[in-house]
Amino acid sequence: MGEEAAMATMESAYHDELAPAAAPAPAKGGGSKKKRKQQKREEKRKECRLVSYHELPDYMKENEFILDYYRSEWPILNALLSLFSWHNETINIWTHLLGFVLFFGLTVLHLGQYFPQVADLIGHLSWPISKVAENVSSNIGDVLSGAASFMQASPASSAGAMAAAWPVTAAAAATTRWPFFVFLAGAMFCLLSSAACHLLSCHSHRLNLFLIRLDYTGIAVMIVVSFFPPIYYIFQCEPRWQVVYLSAITAAGVATVYALMSPRLSAARYRAHRALLFVAMGLSGVVPAAHAVAVNWHEPRRNVTLAYEGAMAASYLAGTAFYLTRVPERWRPGMFDLCGHSHQIFHALVIAGALAHYAAAIVFIQARDEMGCPAP
């Protein structure tokens, strides 16, 4: 019995030596909490890293010639904060965000001509915006020369000073401004929805699809509202043509948005189909444009407005060409990931086209203020 007990004791000791040492009990207090927080931070850091094109989920694969610096399925807060970091959407976001700020500034300036409270607000709060709008106008030169009288407000401008920049005469008061403000509002909606899409579509598949549809809607709205100032003011004395042309382009815009609500058309392979829908909407303006030229053949400002509208059309068509061909990144994949790729060029040309159309709208309004309509 004694020998058996000794053998059992030795065997137990042998197994104890082979057994792994027990893990030390977690320290009481904040040590374990700190470790857990550090682990969570590390996980979040890994989640929010920039990834390559091949690491993206299929729904985010839009341009295979941009190889790196993608945000993929980031938390919404991190996506928002990426506004201030460098990735392949940074310039896309800021071009249209700054464009929105510019058009917002122009809208506030023009509202100030009719509402003294807005004019006072410009004097106290909006000096930087008005200066940006003024500087952009002067840098563009002749293309925006027609808008110069709108930009003379000083930082302390009052309602009287605003009115002096563009006197609201009796004729002007009779010429409604709502089509002009419809254009400005549509431009702001397009630019802001585009910036939001590029900023937040990296969050999830569901939000990506929603924001892409919002972006397409913004483009369609921009095209539709661009028709309002020229058609309304050129055909102000012939209301039936106002109704015909504005109804037609609005219906075309609604039909285009409805077609683009299909998730299938959001896929990258339908890029050309989407672009052609928008181009068709824009080119539908050839008919009212030809009619307008015929009606105003002897109007001395005809060539000025045609130059502005030609600049707008050239900007939009060139932007569409970059969007479709994906040049220059197609030539050197990876070289233009962060700066200089086609979508960034497209964004810059959209801003240029919108500003050219803004200048044309100013000329249309001034011409209508001076001419009025002949007595029946």
UniProtKB/Swiss-Prot annotation:
Region feature (Disordered): 20-46
Gene Ontology CC terms, in alphabetical order: membrane
Stretches in topological domain Cytoplasmic: 1-90, 201-216, 262-274, 325-344
GO molecular function: signaling receptor activity
Keyword Transmembrane helix: yes
InterPro entries in UniProt: AdipoR/HlyIII-related (IPR004254)
Residue spans crossing the bilayer: 91-111, 180-200, 217-237, 241-261, 275-295, 304-324, 345-365
Positions on the Extracellular side per record topology: 112-179, 238-240, 296-303, 366-376
Function, as annotated: May play a role in abiotic stress response.
Name this protein carries in UniProt: Heptahelical transmembrane protein ADIPOR1
Organism: Oryza sativa subsp. japonica (Rice)
Organism lineage string: Eukaryota, Viridiplantae, Streptophyta, Embryophyta, Tracheophyta
Gene, per the UniProt record: ADIPOR1
